[in-house]
Amino acid sequence: RKTGKKGRYSMNEKQFRQFRGLDSDFLYELKEGKLHSILEFERKHKKSFMVEIRNNFLDLYFLGHGIEVKRSKGRYYLRASYRFNPEQLLNADLKKVVKGCRNNKWQISFDDIEKEDSNSFNEIMTSIILKIVAHKKGDISEGVSEINHFLDNRIIGKNGILVIDRQVVYPGSGRGRIDLLGLKRLNNGKFTFVVLELKNKYNSDIANVFTDQVKRYIDLVYDKYEDFRITYKEVLKQKITLGLMKPIDCDIALKNEISKRDIEGIVILDNYDIKYDLKDDGLLHRALKDWANLGDKYNAKLFLKTNVLDSTFFMD
């Protein structure tokens, strides 16, 4: 098998930067090797567990919290915060595979997991999830909102949005982290990007979310558009290959085929009581003013308490 290479590029595409994607070694281990248990676990828990592709590592998400799968010196490791250390919940044989790691994290080598029985990964992940649930203390997080919106948009409709990634950072840009990144169909049948910002309950950032965050994220995607296009062309291909997405033909438009207004910004206020905040100096009132200040160069929408991301819904 070929090793150490990401997806192939055309001559014109080589000038652009692919900032997320897995090389052939990582893909092999997921499909046929020691990491295959991750895909099996995802298939059994699609409604609450997500796998996202990074730059030659993975983030596994549950209730908004990430567990990393990283490679170091040819070995693969499961890593997370000490808050979610599963050691005390594991049987005696598995306790010994949990090791300390830098930056206040623990880690487990997949080589050690492989030496145990076939249910070892399931037991480890179940224990981590129990620790996350205990940490949340029953309180819904913005991460739960992300799961809900992601699951409801895995399949794209005529006017819908396909969510393709979450917690998107363009390396070195210093322009923040996009909650969710999606694709929408243009009139010509091709696709372009949508940035989604989720606000849970009465987050003070709501007041300036359009001019502070939505504008910044749209500018980032537009400025680095071809890097985003090349990256997610490959990420979509890899997700489909790994069974993380159903097959779908998304021809992402070139930058010269779109305008900045084609890149839509969507704000979702979730778990939000409108009546409670219905006052002149309330967050919603200030957000509406901020929305107006965005101007005509940007295309933005606001959704309240909905899991239906569709251009026919609510505010336009």
Spans of features found by a protein language model:
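Charged, terminal alpha-helix-loop-beta segments
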Residues: 4-316
